[in-house]
């Protein structure tokens, strides 16, 4: 028996599963029609129509493979239940976040280094997945498919009316906010009543001011958050001077509605908010720009992470040829565009794709592969970092910054004690690989 490492509720349930179960599951051939059945379970139910169209298109053009794509409302719960029954899909479509890290740590995914389509994926998104490994691993275990982008959405009509230009440094951003205030307009609107929205500006600032692998450095014992996150925490709190009074009284929907109605010129949030905003004001002219947290414009990067990526479950080697054929189909340019048109996402594949207009200001970063992942993709959910940030923002005491940063380090150790021990043991055995300074 092999005991899986526990990190999420899924893995707690899986804890005592034997490695051999990966060799069981659905048969390769459907006895009814002799086709090889490839089943995908993906976690984005909002994209169900796009995947239904892709499934139908694939099955209409392939005689020897039948593709089945399931898009349940709570994919992680569905997967957990199926894993208990030892009923594994062939491919899972999940985000590049802590769940992916835990699946990797539990040896649940197949090494797909030999998949030729990897050469067409932007390097930043491949790097993102490597940084999600708790300890360095040989091989590649996911193919990034779609990403999202976060920064600052702005009302393009208001900007053009006043002749405001897009800031490229933090000082320029502060000056812009002051100009907007002088015009009698609110620069920013926040929905901090919903604590998760505190992570939007946090992530957008952190990609510029903190190393992308800072969490790995902390686990390795070569860095502390109290140093790495100090400038991030200082900048996020400075934004309150340009927002509505008591932003903790308003939630995400309130902020989307206020921005849609022109109550603020800007909204620090991801591109995922645009459909909600457009539901209030379908004709709103929205564009976006990268949060300019650096003094040097060349050092600014786009906050963009793997929103959807494909991993093959371990033990599916007998289906590998059919699985790779499905992946090839999904990565055909016209099929990627089908998803983009439906979901307003960012493609992880290199190529000339038509992006939604609200990403125009971010195109240079997307096309130049100048991107870094969301810091919160490395945070354990039980640590509730979003609530910690909200508490810090509400704290007006003189020592609020130090209190917050010290708590971040303390809570990180509390919720990652076993992981830290594992990582530090690894680097004791592999001292030449020790992480320092964003390596």
Locations of regions flagged by a protein language model:
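A structural signal for short loop-to-beta-strand junctions that line the ligand-binding cleft
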Residues: 81-82, 89-90, 119-157, 186-190, ...
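Extracytoplasmic/periplasmic substrate-recognition and gating elements
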Residues: 60-61, 66, 138, 162, ...
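Conserved C-terminal helix/tail region of periplasmic/extracytoplasmic solute-binding proteins
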Residues: 160, 368-439
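Extracytoplasmic/periplasmic solute-binding protein
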Residues: 135-145, 150, 174-221, 264
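Extracytoplasmic "Venus flytrap"/periplasmic binding protein-like
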Residues: 57, 61-125, 157, 161-162, ...
């Amino acid at each position: 028996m092999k005991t899986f490492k526990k990190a999420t509720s899924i893995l707690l349930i899986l804890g005592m599963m034997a490695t051999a179960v990966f060799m069981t599951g659905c048969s390769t051939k459907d006895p009814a029609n002799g086709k090889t059945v490839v089943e995908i379970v993906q976690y984005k139910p909002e994209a169900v129509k796009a995947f239904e169209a892709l499934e139908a298109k694939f099955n209409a053009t392939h005689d020897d493979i039948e593709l089945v794509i399931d898009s349940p409302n709570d994919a992680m719960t569905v997967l957990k239940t199926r894993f208990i029954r030892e009923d594994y899909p062939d491919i899972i479509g999940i985000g590049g976040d802590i769940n992916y890290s835990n699946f990797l740590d539990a040896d649940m995914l197949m090494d797909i280094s030999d998949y030729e389509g990897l050469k067409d994926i932007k390097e930043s998104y491949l790097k993102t997945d490597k940084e999600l490994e708790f300890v360095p691993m040989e091989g590649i275990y996911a193919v990034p498919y779609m990403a999202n982008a976060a920064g600052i959405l702005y009302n393009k009509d208001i900007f053009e009316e006043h002749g405001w230009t897009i800031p490229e440094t933090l000082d320029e951003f502060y000056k812009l906010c002051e100009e907007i205030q002088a015009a009698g307009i609110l620069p920013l609107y926040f929905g901090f009543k919903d604590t998760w929205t505190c992570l939007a500006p946090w992530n957008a600032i952190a990609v510029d001011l903190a190393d992308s692998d800072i969490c790995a450095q902390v686990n390795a014992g070569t860095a502390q958050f109290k140093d790495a996150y100090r400038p991030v925490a200082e900048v996020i709190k400075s934004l309150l001077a340009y927002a509505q009074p008591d932003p903790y009284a308003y939630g995400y929907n309130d902020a989307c509605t206020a921005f849609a109605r022109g109550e603020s010129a800007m909204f620090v949030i991801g591109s995922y908010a645009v459909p909600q905003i457009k539901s209030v004001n379908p004709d709103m002219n929205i564009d976006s720009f990268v949060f300019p947290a650096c003094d040097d414009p060349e050092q600014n990067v786009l906050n963009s992470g793997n929103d959807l990526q494909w991993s093959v479950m371990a033990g599916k080697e007998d289906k590998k040829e059919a699985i790779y054929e499905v992946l090839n189909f999904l990565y055909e340019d016209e099929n990627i565009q089908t998803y983009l048109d439906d979901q307003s996402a960012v493609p992880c594949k290199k190529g000339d794709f038509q992006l939604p207009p609200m990403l125009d200001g971010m195109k240079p970063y997307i096309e130049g592969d100048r991107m870094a992942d969301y810091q919160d993709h490395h945070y354990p959910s039980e640590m509730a970092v979003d609530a910690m940030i909200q508490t810090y923002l509400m704290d007006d005491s003189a020592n609020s910054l130090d209190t917050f940063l010290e708590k971040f380090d303390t809570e990180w150790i509390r919720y990652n004690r076993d992981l830290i021990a594992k990582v530090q043991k690894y680097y004791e055995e592999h001292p030449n690989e020790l992480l320092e300074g964003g390596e």
